[in-house]
């Protein structure tokens, strides 16, 4: 039975959100509902044929637009994994292993669309270590995630004037858009939506520096995100429609960050910046762009802002008149003032949820982060204010944790030429796992050689062979791996270099075939499978017209060889071998 979680008091929440909107507070999208779910009090264990077991637990919280899970502790043994999926299984996270889940800290899995969610833990028979899964909170999302619903084909969250980033207006900003992220922030039990950007630095070490607004780390009552809260922030990459019209949304994300620097003091917000470092390297397959920036005081005559208004997919707003300087709090010249321009596909403005979004100059360099303003679809002439990178560089305070400079120019490289400019870049140093093999189809008992194709010059390799002997290897190119189990087998490779680790799982990569011989035959064939057949073996014989002629069932057999006498009439038969969920088809010719 699923764990039914009581819906939060939405009437009270909506009233609070209405009051917050009137006072330009952060855009709340969700609330954490406390739960206590673990092996000892919830879910169901299932023993698997041949060993191993699964623990499965489902949670339902009616009315949710999306649901995520917060873990007080999660510790998985090597070889074990978890999947998290929606009730209809249209959205899936996983497999997550001990490689992907950080140790000794809290963790979260991102919200999935709908009001029901299931966690499935798989434990192979070889595991001796005790896993720990302690779910302490259900993340109840009630707005801002409309585009993540696979059934939706319209952009429902943000204003109708907004322009999708892959319309014509975004053609010259395709690199920069890959450095813009949607952020689901956690402040205590409250969840907010903001926008941020991934930054390059002069060391070009691709550390995962993420910039947003300082006020994104506060709730509507000025409560501040704790260090523990930051470990459960979620950063969404490439959250956009594939074209100018709704459709083709993809969702990729990383979890967790560490706060490095913030502009705010108890008396003044300053230039309203927050700089973080992601706890995990940005996966190479995200093809993320590390944005360049300009900390000089030069004005920009034109440019764009790329953002996630109201938590929606990525939008682009364009300015075509020179910026001016102004203030948000009490300190002068902390912000750029921006007026937006109409374009071919709309009139891009900003909205709640756009906070922290990058402002780019005409050279494509980041020069500001959004604090707020009064532009919206019914007030397109309103002015928006972006904290200036030139001010954030060193002017908010004297310590490193109030400046951008120590983190963006750690070696003081830019002091030599006097230009505080850094171009953006894609990361060509990351390890990206990939591999191939000398063959993909083998008979029972056959051997395969594997070849590493990973980018980034890995220094360590860890292979996992489902059904293989040995089941693991640490060489670069392992050879002679024996597969003596019937069916399609998964192969996983984890590679590591000086910068990161990456993994890839190729499902059903090796097709281990039953041996049907002799073929051609004189009416009798022998079928060799394997002894791992607790689920039983079914052999079906079809004639050339597709009609079933024979059916044999072997339940609980420990044999790996079966002799079948084929029908006396006919020269061509199809032999179907079924073992559990594995099905193979063989053509057999009979000589009379």
Sequence positions of predicted segments:
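Short, surface-exposed beta-strand/strand-loop-strand elements in extracellular ectodomains
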Residues: 76-90
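Serine endopeptidase catalytic core focused on the charge-relay Asp
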Residues: 112-339, 352
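Catalytic nucleophile loop of clan PA
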Residues: 197-208, 348-370
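C-terminal subregion of chymotrypsin/trypsin-like serine protease catalytic domains
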Residues: 210, 225-229, 247-257, 266, ...
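Proline-enriched interdomain boundary motifs that mark the N-terminal boundary
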Residues: 429-437, 513-516
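A short beta-strand segment in extracellular, disulfide-stabilized domains
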Residues: 445-454, 524-528
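Surface-exposed, flexible coil segments in extracellular/virion-facing regions
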Residues: 458-481
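C-terminal outer-membrane/trafficking sorting elements
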Residues: 460-464, 486-494, 502-517, 521-592
């Amino acid at each position: 039975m699923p764990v039914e979680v009581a819906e939060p008091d939405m009437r009270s929440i909506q009233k609070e959100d209405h009051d917050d909107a009137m006072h330009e507070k952060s855009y709340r999208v969700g609330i954490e509902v406390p739960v206590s779910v673990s092996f000892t009090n919830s879910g169901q264990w299932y023993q698997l044929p041949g060993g191993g077991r699964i623990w499965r637990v489902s949670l339902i919280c009616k009315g949710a637009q999306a649901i995520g899970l917060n873990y007080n502790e999660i510790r998985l043994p090597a070889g074990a994994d978890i999947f998290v999926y929606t009730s209809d299984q249209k959205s899936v996270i996983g497999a997550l292993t001990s490689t992907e889940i950080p140790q000794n800290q809290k963790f979260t899995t991102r919200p999935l669309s709908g009001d029901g969610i299931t966690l499935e833990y798989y434990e192979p028979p070889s595991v001796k270590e005790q896993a720990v899964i302690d779910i302490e909170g259900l993340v109840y999302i009630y707005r801002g995630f409309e585009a993540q619903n696979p059934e939706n084909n319209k952009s429902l969250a943000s204003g109708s004037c907004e322009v999708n980033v892959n319309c014509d207006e975004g053609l010259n900003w395709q690199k920069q858009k890959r450095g813009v992220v949607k952020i689901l922030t956690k402040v205590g039990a409250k969840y907010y939506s903001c926008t941020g950007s991934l930054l390059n630095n002069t060391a070009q070490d691709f550390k995962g520096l993420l910039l947003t607004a300082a006020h994104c780390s506060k709730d509507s009552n000025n409560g501040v995100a704790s260090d523990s809260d930051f470990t459960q922030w979620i950063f969404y990459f490439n959250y956009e429609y594939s074209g100018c019209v709704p459709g083709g949304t993809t969702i990729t994300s990383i979890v967790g960050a560490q706060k490095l620097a913030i502009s705010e003091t108890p008396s003044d917000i300053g230039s309203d910046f927050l700089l973080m470092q992601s706890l995990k390297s940005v996966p190479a397959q995200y093809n993320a762009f590390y944005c360049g920036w300009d900390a000089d005081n030069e004005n920009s005559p034109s440019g764009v802002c790329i953002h996630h208004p109201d938590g929606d997919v990525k939008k682009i707003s364009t300015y075509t008149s020179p910026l001016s300087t102004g203030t948000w709090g009490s300190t002068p010249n902390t912000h750029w003032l921006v007026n937006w321009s109409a374009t071919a596909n709309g009139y891009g403005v900003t909205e709640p949820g756009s906070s922290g979004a990058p402002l780019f100059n005409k050279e494509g360099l980041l020069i500001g982060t959004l604090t707020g303003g009064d532009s919206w679809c019914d007030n397109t002439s309103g002015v928006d204010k972006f904290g200036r990178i030139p001010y954030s560089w060193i002017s908010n305070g004297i310590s490193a944790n109030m400046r951008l400079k120590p983190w963006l120019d750690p070696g003081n490289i830019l002091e030599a030429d006097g230009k505080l400019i850094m171009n953006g870049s894609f990361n060509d140093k990351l390890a990206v796992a990939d591999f191939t093999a000398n063959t993909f189809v083998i008979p029972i008992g056959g051997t395969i050689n594997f070849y590493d194709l990973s980018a980034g010059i890995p220094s360590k390799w860890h292979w996992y062979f489902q059904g293989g002997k040995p089941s693991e290897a640490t060489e670069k190119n392992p050879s002679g791996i024996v597969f003596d189990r019937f069916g399609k087998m998964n192969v996983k490779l984890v590679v590591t270099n000086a910068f990161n680790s990456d993994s890839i799982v190729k499902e059903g990569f090796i097709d281990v075939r039953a041996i049907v011989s002799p073929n051609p035959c004189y009416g009798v064939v022998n079928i060799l499978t394997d002894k791992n057949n607790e689920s039983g073996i079914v052999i079906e014989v079809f004639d050339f017209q597709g009609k079933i002629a024979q059916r044999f069932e072997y339940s609980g057999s420990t044999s790996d060889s079966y002799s079948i006498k084929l029908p006396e009439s006919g020269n061509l038969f199809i032999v179907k071998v079924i073992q559990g969920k594995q099905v193979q088809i063989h053509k057999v010719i009979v000589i009379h």
